[in-house]
Amino acid sequence: MAVFTPPSGNSNSTDHTHTQDDHDKDDNDIKKFYIRPSLGLKLWGPLVPAPDNLPGLYTLITIQSAVGFFALWRLRRLYKLPPPRRIATGTHSDLSFGELPSEMIVNGKTKIKKDIADFPTLNRFSTTHGDIVLAPPPIIPRQSRFVSVRKLLWGLFGSLLLSQSLLELTRLNFLKYDPWCDEMKSVRDKKFFNNIVKYYHEGIDPTKIKVKDAMNGTPLSTNIPEVKQSVALARAQVEAQNPIIKWFGPLEYKPMSFNEYLNRMEFHLDMFEFFQNKRNIRENSIELINSISHNPQSSSTGLEGLSESKKLHLQNVEKRLHFLASSGDSISAPVKKRSSTTLSRGVILPHDTKGPQDIDLDTIRSLYDPWMTLALETSLSIKFIPTTMPSHTKTPTSTDQPLPGPTPKALTNEKTH
């Protein structure tokens, strides 16, 4: 006889606390938003669209390129040389911005009209007028440090934006395989089917959704499995067409790291190179065999530049080809007597058919298509519901009643003849 001692209340409260903390942690992980991966749009931060959202990517690339060109245009304006000084031409002279009215250039020398009385070291009461000759102005005008810093910032900013836009365009247009794009497409499909299962088990609220027959308009019961499946599919499609979901993809999606991206790209390139080399070897082998079989006299002259092992191999291939050709001409195929003009598959041949060469394969296949025969003789009814369940779905206990409709693992095949 055994005595069962229930656990103390403290342990229950501790377990409940841990369970609640784990649940809150899972909710926080689900609500966490990850920045979508990109090579040249990282400056946009969380506004970067999903890797398979091509309209969104091209929109951001266009805006980023326009801002980069604007920055270079501002740099060009800062690098513009200042306008020339006022040049005296006869009685007319042009006045440029930032100059004194009395400043002009005559015969390559800068002169400033000044009154001697304006200088305090000279006679203040003198009314004599004269020209003060200054040194010629520098070819490259001196600029302040602030202008130099502005040039540097505008140049770096514009070059950075344009280089990033070019990098992203290269990824979108020149890469035949993009791991980020393929991953996002698979995540969207999984999310779509998970939503179907989720909405199917949630059921239909009669106060919010009413289902009517498309033929006569009579209301249908919301407990019918087919109706629940149709409503779940419609709700999943509406959520997939949400503008936020179309722009970012599923919000809980966590993209792969850049290292994993590079590893997948490297694996794809290695496999592509492997299959390409295999295809080239096969084509070269077929071409070599055809050349040997058609020109046996010239094949011996082409063996001079090859190694000994390759020479022996090609000679063996040539001998086998000649043996097969000679044996095929000397030995005739045995003639079999056909007792009936009806094949085992129900194909009726014409009465004048004496050999395989008298059969019109195109006509026979059009009349006795095996796939069409299989389709007419077979009727399949397959119902498939994904087994993926949402994480927050309540696990049924032994006392809970099973929900109506098919189970998540239901897969029925019905075959009738």
UniProtKB/Swiss-Prot annotation:
Single GO biological process annotation from the record: protein import into mitochondrial intermembrane space
Record region (Disordered): 1-28, 391-417
Compositionally biased spans, kind Polar residues? 391-401
Mitochondrial matrix topological intervals: 74-151
Listed under GO cellular component are: i-AAA complex; mitochondrial inner membrane; mitochondrion
**Topological relation to the membrane, as annotated:** Multi-pass membrane protein
Q: Which GO terms describe its molecular function?
A: misfolded protein binding
Mitochondrial intermembrane side stretches: 1-56, 170-417
Specify the domain of life of the species encoding this protein: Eukaryota
User: Which UniProt keywords are present, listed alphabetically?
Assistant: Membrane, Mitochondrion, Mitochondrion inner membrane, Transmembrane, Transmembrane helix
Residue spans crossing the bilayer: 57-73, 152-169
Which subcellular locations apply to this protein? Mitochondrion inner membrane
Question: Other remarks?
Answer: Present with 3410 molecules/cell in log phase SD medium.
Q: Which family does it belong to?
A: Belongs to the MGR1 family.
**Known partners and oligomeric status:** Component of the mitochondrial inner membrane i-AAA protease supercomplex composed of MGR1, MGR3 and YME1. With MGR3, forms a subcomplex that binds to YME1 and to substrates to facilitate proteolysis. Interacts directly with YME1.
What job does the chain carry out? Component of the mitochondrial inner membrane i-AAA protease supercomplex required for mitochondrial inner membrane protein turnover. Together with MGR3, functions in an adapter complex that targets substrates to the i-AAA protease for degradation. Required for growth of cells lacking the mitochondrial genome.
The molecule here is called Mitochondrial inner membrane i-AAA protease supercomplex subunit MGR1
User: What is this protein's gene name?
Assistant: MGR1
